[in-house]
């Protein structure tokens, strides 16, 4: 996971001994944008004013966002935390997963039902991409 080296989380990541990667459904895009772009690195509580509420992970020492469709619970590998070019890179061990019951069937996890926006930022701009069930066979492009 990468984060701005000057951010609140970057300052705490080595001491909290746990973090959750929360995947929120597209219905939360307003809250996602507010936390990510408006509050960003300027506030310790970047979720203030978003309406998001939090629970406590039972697996790692970290909060999780109530309403997240999918959560990955991790512990940082402190000897593998590297800061380079203003970005703190944190390697972690996955300790658990949480997901909405509607995403599970007798056949396993239903990726096609997962409705989370994927944020992409590059020199062309910043966009949210939606997950779909469309696929392309690997190796079919050459």
Q: Language-model features: where?
A:
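Basic, polyanion-binding surface patches
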Residues: 1-142
């Amino acid at each position: 996971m990468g984060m701005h080296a000057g951010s609140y989380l970057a300052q705490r990541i080595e001491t909290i001994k746990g973090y959750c990667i929360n995947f929120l459904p597209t219905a939360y895009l307003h809250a996602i944008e507010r936390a990510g772009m408006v509050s960003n690195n300027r506030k310790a509580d970047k979720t203030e004013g978003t309406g998001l509420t939090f629970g406590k992970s039972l697996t790692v020492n970290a909060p999780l966002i109530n309403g997240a469709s999918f959560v990955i619970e991790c512990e940082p590998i402190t000897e593998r935390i590297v800061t380079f070019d203003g970005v703190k890179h944190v390697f972690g061990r996955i300790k658990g997963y949480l997901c909405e019951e509607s995403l599970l069937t007798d056949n396993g996890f239903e990726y096609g039902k997962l409705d989370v926006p994927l944020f992409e930022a590059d020199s062309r701009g910043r966009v949210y991409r939606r997950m779909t069930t469309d696929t392309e066979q690997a190796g079919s492009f050459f």
